Amino acid sequence: MAISKDDILEAVGSMTVMELNDLVKAFEEKFGVSAAALAVAAPGAGGAAAPAAEEKTEFDVILTAAGEKKVEVIKVVRAATGLGLKEAKDVVDGAPKAVKEGIAKADAEALKKQLEDAGAKVEIK
């Protein structure tokens, strides 16, 4: 018997956030994809190709180093991303790593300032 889409949606709907996180990681490993890359690419998927000369409107905030106040940096990462403590710590420990991707320039600059105020080294790409 094949599993229907409704069965899958029902199962996913009853999962906790941690279970969903594990499921996403399993998809990434099994199929060799990245959920972050899909989320960034998805909004433009239905439109026409953008001209090459167009100004960049989406930016990635990259944490290059946590600095000496690692706990403060973790707090800022949690507040900005909505991640749990372990996930935010993994981002900080895994530097250089993207904290947020595909955000507006003003939001990227604000997040960069918050992270730098907490003691982190940050770059915007």
Curated annotation (Swiss-Prot):
Recorded superkingdom: Bacteria
* UniProt keyword terms in alphabetical order: Ribonucleoprotein, Ribosomal protein
List the GO cellular component terms: cytosolic large ribosomal subunit
Please cite one Gene Ontology biological process associated with this protein. translation
List the coiled-coil residues: none
Q: What Gene3D superfamilies does the database record attribute to this sequence?
A: 3.30.1390.10, Single helix bin (1.20.5.710)
Question: Which GO molecular function, any one, fits this protein according to its record?
Answer: structural constituent of ribosome
InterPro entries named among the record's database cross-references:
Ribosomal_bL12, Ribosomal_bL12_C, Ribosomal_bL12_C/ClpS-like, Ribosomal_bL12_oligo, Ribosomal_bL12_oligo_N_sf
Assembly and binders = Homodimer. Part of the ribosomal stalk of the 50S ribosomal subunit. Forms a multimeric L10(L12)X complex, where L10 forms an elongated spine to which 2 to 4 L12 dimers bind in a sequential fashion. Binds GTP-bound translation factors.
Q: What does this protein do?
A: Forms part of the ribosomal stalk which helps the ribosome interact with GTP-bound translation factors. Is thus essential for accurate translation.
Family according to the record? Belongs to the bacterial ribosomal protein bL12 family.
Protein name stated in the entry: Large ribosomal subunit protein bL12
Native organism: Azoarcus sp. (strain BH72)
